[in-house]
């Protein structure tokens, strides 16, 4: 029987950093079902006490991402008095950076959410990904920071949107054997192109499940091994001709594939867009 794990995220901003961290850590405990409760925009001592009182009542772990001066210390002391396990995430990092830079932190909650130029660049990149999804307009390949090529079910669209959230303009093109490859592809720097592939068994099983879900015969040409192998071979030959990076997305998450692409491009994985 799955046990419950209550995780309370306390923040003087939206609490996104604490939530992501809690989710990442909770994933390491598969025998527990995690329940997340956010307490955002905590700007008073009373709200700190109230959140910790509730955490005590529910036997929850409190994860705190305060940057407001004094809040983390106050919450830590109160949690200790109440017998609540509370983790102060931000203070050690702030102290570490302070030691290296000899600068005092601003202690401004939510500073990363300011509507600055980077924010609007990200919105523009998201719009670009939607506009040039699935090769809708070949001219997008010439304007893109990254061009994704791939057979079906290699996560081209979600990967495009994920990278767009890193302020990168991404266009993608689905590959079908003997289909016309737009001339624009050959004008793109191969270093900007990423070829996505997968394992034949993974692609076949996914297609079989899709046909079953549609109430159709799962053993059609769409999912037949010869057809799948033909598609993968077509893509492999094209990637060799282009001379681009190739990534097998089988058993890889969107985040893992994106990290490989960003490393290949020499880009910072987080691109300064993480939220708190």
Swiss-Prot record:
Keywords: Kinase, Nucleotide-binding, Serine/threonine-protein kinase, Transferase
E.C. code: 2.7.11.32, 2.7.4.27
Keyword rRNA-binding found: no
Coiled coil: none
Residues annotated as binding ADP: 150-157
Reactions that this protein is recorded to catalyse: N(tele)-phospho-L-histidyl/L-threonyl-[pyruvate, phosphate dikinase] + ADP = N(tele)-phospho-L-histidyl/O-phospho-L-threonyl-[pyruvate, phosphate dikinase] + AMP + H(+); N(tele)-phospho-L-histidyl/O-phospho-L-threonyl-[pyruvate, phosphate dikinase] + phosphate + H(+) = N(tele)-phospho-L-histidyl/L-threonyl-[pyruvate, phosphate dikinase] + diphosphate
Its job: Bifunctional serine/threonine kinase and phosphorylase involved in the regulation of the pyruvate, phosphate dikinase (PPDK) by catalyzing its phosphorylation/dephosphorylation.
HAMAP family: PDRP
UniProt record similarity statement: Belongs to the pyruvate, phosphate/water dikinase regulatory protein family. PDRP subfamily.
Name of protein: Putative pyruvate, phosphate dikinase regulatory protein
Organism in which the protein naturally occurs: Lacticaseibacillus paracasei (strain ATCC 334 / BCRC 17002 / CCUG 31169 / CIP 107868 / KCTC 3260 / NRRL B-441) (Lactobacillus paracasei)
Lineage: Bacteria, Bacillati, Bacillota, Bacilli, Lactobacillales
């Amino acid at each position: 029987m799955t046990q419950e794990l209550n995780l309370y995220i306390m923040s003087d901003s939206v609490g996104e950093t604490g939530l992501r961290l809690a989710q990442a850590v909770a994933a390491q405990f598969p025998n527990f079902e995690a329940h997340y409760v956010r307490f955002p925009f905590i700007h008073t001592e009373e709200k700190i006490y109230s959140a910790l009182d509730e955490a005590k009542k529910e036997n929850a772990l409190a994860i705190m991402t305060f940057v407001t001066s004094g809040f983390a210390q106050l919450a830590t002391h109160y949690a200790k008095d109440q017998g609540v396990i509370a983790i102060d995430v931000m203070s050690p990092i702030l102290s570490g950076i302070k030691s290296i830079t000899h600068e005092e932190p601003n202690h401004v909650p939510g500073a990363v959410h300011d509507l600055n130029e980077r924010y609007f660049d990200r919105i523009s990149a998201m719009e670009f990904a939607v506009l040039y999804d699935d090769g809708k307009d070949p001219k997008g390949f010439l304007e893109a920071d990254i061009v994704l090529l791939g057979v079906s079910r290699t996560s081209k669209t979600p990967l495009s949107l994920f990278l767009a959230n890193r302020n990168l303009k991404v266009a993608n093109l689905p590959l079908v054997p003997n289909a016309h490859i737009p001339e624009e592809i050959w004008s793109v720097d191969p270093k900007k192109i990423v070829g996505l592939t997968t394992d034949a068994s993974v692609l076949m099983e996914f297609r079989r499940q899709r046909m079953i879900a549609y109430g159709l015969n799962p053993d059609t040409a769409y999912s037949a091994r010869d057809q799948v192998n033909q598609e993968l071979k077509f893509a492999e030959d094209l990637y060799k001709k282009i001379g681009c990076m190739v990534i097998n997305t089988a058993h890889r998450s969107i985040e893992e594939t994106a990290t490989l692409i960003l490393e290949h491009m020499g880009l910072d994985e987080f691109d300064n867009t993480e939220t708190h």
